[in-house]
């Protein structure tokens, strides 16, 4: 079989202007970037304001493993197969961060014959949205540092006289706004800034990856440009010496930060291998952020097609949970069905049983033990009142006997149905039955419900998420986290939903605990207020907001050939 890059480079593409017209966009609603991608202007939202809406399908997965579960492959394959059976469908996915592309995970365009193409354009830069987020974010960091510098050297009276601005009295120890970078770079996690003569005052800071920026979450959760401007104004950059919030609006930088992102708020239109449309927009990670593509992209697609396929990052305890409790809570766009992706390899890897046996060989004991993880995720999705279809992403090494065993086991659960997907190897022809089953599931009446109400306390929300959402015995709050609960409550933010930043490699906080962990306590070391995005992040265990590169990073394989074409992406 050809590599992903070879398949992408040999694809016959529809001109993006024609693709947009087929989708229902007007020429003036598209800003073309060559023939392969286009920005979609938000004026389409107003034009289609009264349009009936299609059905939203959320794709999630079991607990991820190093073998790859194929969630994006399934999302794109399902979109292709829906088109093949005569349904008007559109995928809505996140823009890949270059951190994972050059790190361990690789690209995020799907794979095999279920890809968004050209995949190299999607995985590297695309239309520059992530760079815009980085620039806007770092402008905020530069502005707060500059304001601190000038206020410190001049004092209140002279600063106000010279600048015509109010003295903010910034507390250097309470500057909450780091800088960001779209690469994995662990040495920047903790830094001191302001060193050297006339550069201070010195204060502790750090860098996060851009996907963890609150601006990225704002991009994904905004309803329109005006909403994004208002949210950016609410960003909490620091506290003053009296413990009061200093926002981007207070600093006078919110307008300029928004100006940098006026094009980034427009989704990018691309296509799958069989010419189905795909809107790519925003890229928050699901472990350290809320892990879903934008509300705007979903809104546009739902007004143009019958079925919108979107996905949440990592397992159902991560991106799917945040899709429900954060994204849907803010958008009101309720899903009609869910697709839960699994593989035989994933179940064996999640069994918790150490084995020297090749994971590609039949292993009844590990498969049956690992099924508990899939069963947990089925029940977790069903908890939200959404019909769930299990998609088994087939690998070439899978045996029919093990596949049939798994289908029979799934049919004894709360799942609506179970289908084997060959989208990776067969493209649109490989997920036809999955498409039919998903259509039937979406035609049933979803009874969507949230996990907790807005008016619950922050501590109650954290406890509910840990105990009901993960099956934990409870939570433990550090002294810092307890103080932050009190602080955020006193500032009027207790109504916000919570976003757990934890490992994706286990349902629990501990990546070593496989399968369905029990009797564990979720340790919450700190909270982060995201007043603009509209949620409070809980940092669980040792999760980092700036990843690091491994000993064999992905960039080692990436180069250009003699013709100047990119090679090694996948």
Curated annotation (Swiss-Prot):
GO terms for biological process: tetrahydrofolate interconversion. It holds the Pfam family FTHFS. Its EC number is 6.3.4.3. Gene3D superfamilies: Domain 2, N(10)-formyltetrahydrofolate synthetase, Formyltetrahydrofolate synthetase, domain 3, P-loop containing nucleotide triphosphate hydrolases. GO terms for molecular function: ATP binding; formate-tetrahydrofolate ligase activity. It catalyses: (6S)-5,6,7,8-tetrahydrofolate + formate + ATP = (6R)-10-formyltetrahydrofolate + ADP + phosphate. Transmembrane segments: none annotated. Pathway: One-carbon metabolism; tetrahydrofolate interconversion. ATP binds at residues 65-72. Keywords: ATP-binding, Ligase, Nucleotide-binding, One-carbon metabolism. It is an enzyme of class 6 (ligase). Belongs to the formate--tetrahydrofolate ligase family. HAMAP family: FTHFS. This is Formate--tetrahydrofolate ligase.
């Amino acid at each position: 079989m050809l590599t992903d890059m070879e398949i992408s480079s040999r694809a016959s593409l529809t001109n993006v202007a024609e693709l947009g017209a087929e989708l229902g966009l007007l020429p003036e609603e598209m800003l073309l970037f060559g023939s392969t991608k286009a920005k979609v202007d938000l004026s389409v939202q107003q034009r289609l304001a009264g349009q009936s809406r299609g059905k939203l399908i959320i794709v999630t997965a079991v607990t991820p493993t190093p073998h790859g579960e194929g969630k994006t492959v399934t999302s794109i394959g399902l979109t292709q197969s829906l088109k093949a059976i005569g349904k008007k469908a559109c995928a809505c996915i996140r823009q890949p961060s270059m951190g994972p592309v050059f790190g361990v995970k690789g690209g995020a365009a799907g794979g095999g014959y279920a890809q968004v193409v050209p995949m190299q354009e999607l995985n590297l830069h695309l239309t520059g949205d992530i760079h815009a987020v980085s620039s806007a974010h770092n402008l905020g960091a530069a502005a707060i540092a500059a304001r601190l510098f000038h206020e410190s050297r001049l004092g209140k009276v002279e600063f106000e006289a010279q600048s015509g601005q109010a003295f903010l009295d910034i507390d250097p120890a309470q500057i909450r706004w780091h800088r960001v970078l779209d690469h994995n770079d662990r040495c920047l996690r903790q830094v001191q800034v302001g060193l050297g003569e006339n550069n201070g005052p010195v204060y502790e800071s750090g860098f996060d990856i851009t996907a963890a920026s609150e601006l990225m979450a704002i991009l994904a959760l905004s309803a329109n440009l005006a909403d994004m401007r208002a949210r950016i104004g609410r960003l909490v950059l620091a506290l003053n010496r009296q413990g009061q919030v200093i926002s981007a609006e207070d600093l006078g930088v919110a307008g300029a930060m928004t100006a940098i992102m006026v094009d980034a708020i427009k989704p990018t239109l691309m296509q799958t291998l069989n010419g189905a449309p795909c809107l790519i927009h925003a890229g928050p990670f699901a472990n350290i952020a809320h892990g879903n593509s934008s509300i705007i992209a979903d809104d546009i697609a739902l007004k143009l097609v019958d079925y919108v396929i979107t996905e949440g990052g990592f397992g159902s305890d991560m991106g799917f949970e945040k899709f429900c409790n954060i994204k849907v809570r803010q958008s009101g766009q309720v899903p009609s069905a869910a697709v839960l992706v699994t593989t035989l390899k994933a179940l064996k890897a999640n069994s918790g049983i150490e084995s020297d046996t090749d994971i590609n060989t039949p292993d009844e004991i590990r498969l049956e033990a690992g099924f508990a993880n899939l069963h947990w995720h089925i029940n977790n999705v069903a908890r939200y009142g959404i019909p769930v279809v299990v998609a088994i992403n087939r690998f070439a090494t899978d045996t029919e006997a093990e596949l049939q065993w798994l289908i029979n086991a799934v049919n004894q659960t709360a799942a609506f149905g179970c289908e084997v997907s060959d989208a990776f190897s067969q493209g649109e022809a490989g997920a036809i039955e999955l498409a039919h089953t998903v259509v039937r599931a979406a035609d049933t009446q979803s009874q969507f419900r949230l996990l907790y109400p807005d008016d619950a306390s922050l501590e109650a929300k954290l406890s509910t998420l840990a105990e009901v959402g993960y099956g934990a015995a409870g939570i433990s709050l550090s002294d810092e986290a307890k103080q932050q609960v009190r602080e955020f409550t006193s500032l009027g933010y207790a109504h916000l939903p919570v976003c757990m930043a934890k490992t994706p490699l286990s349902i629990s906080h501990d990546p070593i605990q496989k399968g369905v962990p029990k009797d564990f306590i979720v340790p919450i070391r700190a909270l982060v207020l995201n007043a603009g995005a509209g949620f409070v992040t809980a940092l669980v265990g040792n999760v980092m907001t700036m990843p690091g590169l491994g000993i064999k990073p992905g960039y080692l394989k990436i180069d250009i050939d003699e013709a100047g074409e990119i090679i090694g992406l996948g």
